[in-house]
């Protein structure tokens, strides 16, 4: 089926190429990767939201009609952002709740996420070396391997690169890549449909298990229980486990201690935001892959303005190329400034509000904003709520009554108590200092 889809797509883009300018073709069509085909629809992977919107609004009909020339059939086309592919696959697999999917092939892996397409810099060199070592010698180098870092820094790329490398060198290897959300959903379905044995066979009879965003199993007792036994079964059988998270194990709240200690058994590698030189290298790599002619001063401008993560960096580049294509203007620093003005100004003008603080703190502790406003006083909610109140008092000009009101109508004395408690604890608690520092970083313009 994959070979049939690739052949169809190659014929399709050959037709499309004759309908577009070279710049438009290279900018929009060349970035598409076919994912799957069924009776009536075809799903295509695209790199970002901006590209998805342009394709849907300007090129979707061209793609559909070009395919119809080849197949005489009008397929429905769905564009998926690369990061959505796993979620979409999860949903497909869950539609048949009477069957636990046992696919352990490379179909779960994005073909773009390989070691040779990963840009190495000071911010990720250690993590890259660790991943390559694991790929070359599964279960012999570091087990488990735990990778952590912020959104869009390349964790998923490195994890899937491990899977590709192992399968390229041993096609018979059983490799499973899964998000923690999918793991949880499959567990729920297996319990509901009395398919526990099939579920356990899928995840405990593999050579390599890659779990992305493992922090989301925190607070889910049944999922943690199941994953604990899965981890033990694989580790005891000398099978490789790779985990990713947005923070180190010690900073994942409501994670069971027995899992936390196991996550720390092997090697922990972090990925930081790319430095200036790495950002330039990433932009050059993207331009080369997409056959884009981008002046050096424009790349310097992008790298100077966009510092947070790789997705935003590549998205800015595509936005500039699109702006150039749609306005028929040559790519220059002035054009780049105009194309990115909304993005840059929104970052520069980002004000810290109570709503923002609640959003960031709840996300950090894997809670809902509603939890902060509820009457619940369990430790896993009360402590993050106090941190959010402390930051609201420290970082905004809102009055104590206004802060209390934002946290479910609490009295101003409750806010004072929270502020004083956190302030006092910060004098001696290094872990709390680290937590506050990590949360505060998320407020800063990037």
Swiss-Prot record:
Annotated spans, Domain III, AAA+ region: 108-324
Subcellular location(s) per record: Cytoplasm
Listed InterPro entries: AAA+_ATPase, Chromosome_initiator_DnaA, Chromosome_initiator_DnaA-like, Chromosome_initiator_DnaA_CS, DnaA_C, DnaA_dom, DnaA_N_dom, DnaA_N_sf
Keywords, ordered alphabetically: ATP-binding, Cytoplasm, DNA replication, DNA-binding, Lipid-binding, Nucleotide-binding
Residue positions binding ATP: 152, 154-156
Region (Domain II): 73-107
PROSITE patterns: DNAA
Record carries keyword Metal-binding: no
Gene Ontology process terms (BP): DNA replication initiation; regulation of DNA replication
Pfam families with a match to the protein in the record: Bac_DnaA, Bac_DnaA_C, DnaA_N
GO molecular function, one term: ATP hydrolysis activity
Cellular component GO terms, alphabetical: cytoplasm; plasma membrane
Stored SMART domains: AAA, Bac_DnaA_C
Stretch list, region Domain IV, binds dsDNA: 325-446
Region (Domain I, interacts with DnaA modulators): 1-73
Subunit structure: Oligomerizes as a right-handed, spiral filament on DNA at oriC.
HAMAP family noted in UniProt: DnaA_bact
UniProt function note: Plays an essential role in the initiation and regulation of chromosomal replication. ATP-DnaA binds to the origin of replication (oriC) to initiate formation of the DNA replication initiation complex once per cell cycle. Binds the DnaA box (a 9 base pair repeat at the origin) and separates the double-stranded (ds)DNA. Forms a right-handed helical filament on oriC DNA; dsDNA binds to the exterior of the filament while single-stranded (ss)DNA is stabiized in the filament's interior.
Domain notes: Domain I is involved in oligomerization and binding regulators, domain II is flexibile and of varying length in different bacteria, domain III forms the AAA+ region, while domain IV binds dsDNA.
Sequence similarity: Belongs to the DnaA family.
Protein name listed in UniProt: Chromosomal replication initiator protein DnaA
Organism: Clostridium acetobutylicum (strain ATCC 824 / DSM 792 / JCM 1419 / IAM 19013 / LMG 5710 / NBRC 13948 / NRRL B-527 / VKM B-1787 / 2291 / W)
UniProt lineage: Bacteria, Bacillati, Bacillota, Clostridia, Eubacteriales
């Amino acid at each position: 089926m994959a070979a049939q889809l690739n052949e169809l797509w190659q014929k399709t883009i050959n037709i499309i190429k004759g309908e577009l300018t070279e710049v438009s073709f290279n900018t929009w069509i060349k970035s598409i990767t076919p994912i799957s085909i069924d009776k009536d629809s075809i799903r295509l992977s695209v790199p970002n939201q901006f590209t998805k919107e342009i394709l849907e609004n300007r090129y979707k009909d061209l793609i559909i009609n070009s395919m119809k020339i080849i197949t005489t059939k009008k397929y429905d086309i769905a564009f998926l952002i690369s990061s959505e592919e796993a979620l979409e696959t999860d949903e497909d697999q869950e539609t048949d709740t009477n069957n636990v999917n046992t696919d352990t092939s490379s179909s779960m892996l994005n073909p773009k996420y390989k070691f040779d397409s990963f840009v190495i810099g000071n911010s990720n060199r250690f993590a890259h070396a660790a991943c390559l070592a694991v790929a070359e010698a599964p279960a012999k180098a570091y087990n488990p391997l735990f990778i952590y870092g912020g959104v869009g820094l390349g964790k998923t790329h490195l994890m899937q690169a491990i899977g590709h490398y192992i399968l390229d060198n041993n096609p018979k290897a059983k490799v499973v890549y899964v998000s923690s959300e999918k793991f949880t959903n499959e567990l729920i379905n297996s319990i509901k449909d009395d398919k526990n044995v099939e579920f356990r066979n899928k995840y405990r009879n593999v050579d390599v298990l890659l779990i992305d965003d493992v922090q989301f199993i925190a607070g889910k007792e049944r999922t943690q229980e199941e994953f604990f036994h899965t981890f033990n079964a694989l580790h005891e059988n000398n099978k490789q486990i790779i985990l990713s998270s947005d923070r180190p194990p010690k900073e994942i709240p409501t994670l069971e201690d027995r899992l936390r200690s196991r996550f720390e058994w092997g090697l922990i590698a972090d990925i930081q935001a790319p430095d200036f030189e790495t950002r330039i290298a990433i932009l050059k790599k993207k331009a080369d892959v997409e056959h884009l002619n981008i002046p050096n001063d424009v790349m310097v401008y992008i790298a100077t303005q966009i510092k947070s993560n790789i997705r935003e960096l590549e998205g800015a580049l595509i936005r500039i190329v699109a702006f150039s294509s749609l306005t028929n203007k040559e790519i220059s620093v002035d054009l780049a400034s105009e194309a990115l003005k909304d993005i840059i100004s929104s970052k520069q003008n980002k004000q810290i509000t109570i709503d923002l603080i609640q959003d960031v703190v709840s996300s950090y502790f894997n809670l809902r904003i509603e939890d902060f406003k509820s009457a619940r006083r369990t430790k896993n909610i009360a402590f993050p709520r106090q941190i959010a109140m402390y930051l609201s008092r420290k970082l905004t000009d809102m009055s104590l009554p206004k802060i209390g009101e934002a946290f479910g109508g609490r009295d101003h004395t409750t806010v004072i108590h929270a502020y004083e408690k956190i302030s006092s604890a910060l004098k001696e608690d290094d872990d709390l200092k680290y937590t506050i520092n990590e949360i505060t970083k998320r407020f800063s313009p990037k």
